[in-house]
Structure formats: C-alpha cells, structure tokens
C-alpha cells in the first residue's frame, strides 16, 4: 500500500522532504516496481523463466565483514565481544564517525521516493524485534518482505519499531581513511539509537545477518539461546536442531519429508521451546537441480527473489554458472516450502542437537554421541574444513574454527552462547551428536544417503541402543552399527588401508583443535573443558 505522505514521519530518523512513502508494498506492487521500464543498473530486476525476479548486487556478492562496525558507547562498552578482544568482526566505531555516516545515509534517502517495510524478527511475541526497513530500492524491500516475519494488518495498527535499518546502498563514505575505517563501504550498528546503517554494498544478506547479530546481542542477555542453526520437528512433536557452517548440510539435512521445517538458519530457544527468527529462507542456488533439491527448486517461483544468478535475454536460468559468484542465492517466503510448521514457525524444546562438520582431513567419524562437556567443547570450537587447491594442483584441507558455528554473527563472547545452550539442553534433557558430512580414508565424501541414515538413527533413538567403541585422541564414542550405513565407515580408521596414516592425520588435527581452544583457557570454565577435547 502507499502510505499518505505524512503518515510515517521519517524526519525522526533525519530523513526529510520525502517524495513518497511506499509502505509495506504487496508482492504484486513489488514485482511491478522492480521490473518496470526505465530502471537501470542494480535497481533493475529481470523476470526469469520460473517466474522469480533476478537481481544483480554488483561487486558485493556476499557480506563485507571487514566493513562491519558497532558504536562503542556506554551501552556496548562492557557487553560486546570486541575485535580487539578476540578474532571477530565487531570493530569499534566512535559516536562521531557514526554521526557522519548517519548524515551520509539520511542525505541520500532525503527527497526520494522510499519503500518502508515493517517486520518482525523472531516468532516469539515476547522477545521479537519489531524492525523497520527504509530503502530506495524496490527489490531490497522485496528481500526483507521475504526474509522477515510479515505482520498482519491488525499487528501493524499500533506498530512502533524497536530497531530501524536505513539502507543507503547508493552512498559511500569518502572520509573512510581519515576515520580509520576499512573502506568507503560500511555496515554499522548503534545499540543506543537502535539503528543499522548500510552504505555502498547492495548485498541483501547484510540486512538479514545484521538483525541476526542484534538478536545474538539481546537474547542471550535474557537467558535465551540464539543459534545459527536449522530446525525441524517430527510427528510426535520431537524437535531437532542442526548447527553447522556453510556447506555442511544444514539446509539439506533439515529438509526432510518425514518432518516439518521450523526454519533453515536462525533460531532462538526460550522457556517455551525453539522458534524461528525469520519468515523466509535464503538458499544457495549454485548447481541447483530439481532432482537433487526439489523443495528449493520448486520454491523458486513468483515472489521469490534470485541474486546474481546467470539469466539470458529470454529469462533462461543457468544455475551451474559461477562466473559471477559461487554465492548465488534465492530468498523466498517460508510458505513456498510445503512441509512447514504452521501457522507460527515454532515448536517445543529440542531433544536432539546435531553439530554438522565437513571434515576434509578424513579424521572424524561419521557420527559420535557427545558428553555434556564435549558438547560445549565442540560448540565453542565450531570446526569444519574445506578442500582448497594449492599452486601445484594438490588439494589440501583448510580448517575453519568458527565459535558456536557462527562467529561472524556473535555480538557477545562465545562462552555466553555456550552457557545458555548448555542450560537449555540440560533443562530439556537434550542429547548432542557430532555428525561428519565430510571425507574419509577412501578420499570420497561420506554419501548423503549414509548421512541421512545416521540422522534417522539419531532422531528415532536407535543410535542410543547401539554398541559403541571409542576413537582415540578425540575420545569420541561411535556406534559399531547403524541401519543403512556400511559398518566399516563408522570407525574412520577402517577406511584407511594403513591405519597409521589415520593416526598421523588425527594427531595433526588434534593439535589444531588444541591450539584453537587455547583462546578459551583464560577462564576457569574454559580450562575445565580442555579435558573434553582431543588429548595428545
């Protein structure tokens, strides 16, 4: 709908002389706005053969973590996990620099025709953030309408935002060098003013992950777990959550015909159970096929929004083309997936917590049941590894340790998330499992068929009745038999012709875990957890 010019007062944010406010536009209006004649550059959307619109985000095909800042003031000084306290993206900004950036964005938005989209972040009424997005660009309004929870007309009647996001993608900061910033682009947060500013980057994910970072600030301080995970629920109301970094299988494994999807990326866990932060999904589309991922493929239709996908003049899509980026994406409202929890994306307490890792070293077992102490250790470690090509063409593993499986989005110290998750799991009697979707001694990746059989065994409880053995160095308890899984792969040592090769690799990986975890040993709790990790 188009709001009367004065019905939403944007001057309270420093935006003046607004030409017109297009308030909470319908999908029909957004479609016509983002594809209308006369649009140029990154404003322009292209209609594809599947009915979804495709947009180009320019050189910004992913987040810009080096351009992320939080104003250091009385609110944040003693709570935020600052980049000078540990390796993270929470760089401090002065209030003076903030004022300058805010002036740039409000000047850019003043005098323009603007889209204002009011949303909820969080499916729990008591703790959700009411987030208002202000942008010049129709498809950016479309993106947040897809990704956040869409309020009803009744909920909009007395809507007062808790947080405001001003997207000034068309402005840059020429004074960045003298201000000691990383570049002319910026993604900045002020927790006193409760505003996020975006400048220079057109990437839609900055709005999504920006609010995730804010939920990661507010919820743990209230004793609520804030998690980078997918979640689903079975017919008996048994909730499962899947932690994992990009490429480990979060979205694929939580999309299960036997279970209803709660959400695919961001969740909270409070006194009532697990709830989604979002109203949509943001899926990778590189090499997407209808055969391999039918749910995601079928979600790409009218109202979905593709980003940086190769589309020809006739609207034909080439999902295999990575010439623009590997990080091609689609956002769509969650109701584009059939098998979802309705009407609200929430369910009861989790009974099964799964940590997904893709171990390219070929060391970790396909599955291990974790003790409470191991759960905290592996959660804080947040390990995965990728195979990266070297100059000589040899592929060698590159380890990634990302605390809580989402260090890029943590606003507080990682131990705060670990403590809250530990309490939630303890109260619910939940059990944790480490599931490796990576490689073993055969040089091949563990098949998705085997991994799905493992997930089934975790969810139906049969894994808990299996006879087990212990993998050395890591002291992980692994089952000897799981239905549907070749028995010899469950102990990774069996996948090597020469078990001493596994030993050497295991020692190497164990050392990497130990070295990474050293940063947590500055507290008594961290020191106590060392015994739960690999022992050399």
From Swiss-Prot:
A GO BP annotation: gluconeogenesis
Give the first-level EC class, as a single word: lyase
Keyword terms of this UniProt record: ATP-binding, Cytoplasm, Decarboxylase, Gluconeogenesis, Lyase, Manganese, Metal-binding, Nucleotide-binding
Provide the binding site for substrate: 63, 203, 209, 329
Q: Pathway involvement? A: Carbohydrate biosynthesis; gluconeogenesis
State how it assembles: Monomer.
- What's the protein called, per UniProt? Phosphoenolpyruvate carboxykinase (ATP)
